[in-house]
Amino acid sequence: MHKIKINMLSNADKVRGQGVGSAYLEQVALVKNELSDYFDVVINDSKPADIIHCHTILPQYLMKMKRNKGINVAYVHFLPDTLDGSIQLPHSALTVFKKYITHFYNTADYLIVVNPIFIKDLVRFGIDEHKIKYIPNFVSKETFYKQEKEHIQQTRSQYHIDENAFVVLGVGQVQTRKGVKDFIEVAKKLPDITFVWAGGFSFGKITDGYEELKEIYENPPHNVHFIGIVPRESMNDIYNMADILFMPSYNELFPMSILEAINSQKPLLLRNL
């Protein structure tokens, strides 16, 4: 039986602490493990493939799509508008970047969105609705799962968190769009509750609100712990040591953290978007 060759193009795993990388790794593992009878998956390969599947929008991937004689698929992990509140660039540079994103998406034969609510936003940017398909994000239950109490207490001890504390967890890059300042304000109003934020400045000084958020990060309230960027293989420990996931984000597509927390059997407190 002839296998369909899929060339997965991505550099998402090169930037630590961002959900795009997690989504990419989960999807590659899913196709390799569950659909290996039908698909031959290669990563960033230079040879021709039946399907090119872009997970990030590097210019070299755009060139590959334009030269490709097979089918081009691009994952929509963010919209042009979600750059606002995520990174800060000069207005002219941001305008050009948004146009580039739209051009990249238009070049693909098919676009995959992880949340159907954003189909209309892509159409607003001039993209043909018929080429947009919805496939939700996926998180393996072998990677994220409920742990035993003894293991949870070990993790709390590692991060100097009292074993009897009620722990509210925030996950994501430290940036304006993620609602970090609201997270802090809630923590100030609940001084007897422990708040933990897992994530950091994945894009350094171009992070939106960097100077203000850096000051908060380095001098948080007494009941807030910023634990930095945690390797993905350790994130299951972090979810398990928490009592609830709190995500005050202002703009999201489909955060991997929600699925990861659900697999770890944690309740969710989310902003109504």
Language-model features, listed with the residues they occupy:
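Nucleotide-activated donor-binding/catalytic signature segment of Leloir-type glycosyltransferases, i.e.
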Residues: Y210-V230
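Conserved donor-binding/catalytic core segment of Leloir-type glycosyltransferases
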Residues: D162-K178, I184-L190, V196-A198
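Aromatic "clamp/platform" in nucleotide-sugar-dependent glycosyltransferases that forms part
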Residues: Y250
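Short alpha-helical donor nucleotide-sugar binding micro-motif in glycosyltransferases
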Residues: I229, D237-A242
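Membrane-proximal helix-turn-helix segments that form the acceptor-binding/catalytic region
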Residues: S92-L111
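Carbohydrate-associated surface elements
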Residues: I117, F138
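Glycosyltransferase donor-sugar binding loop
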Residues: V139, T194-E212, G228
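Short hydrophobic beta-strand element within catalytic cores of glycosyltransferases
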Residues: P267-L270
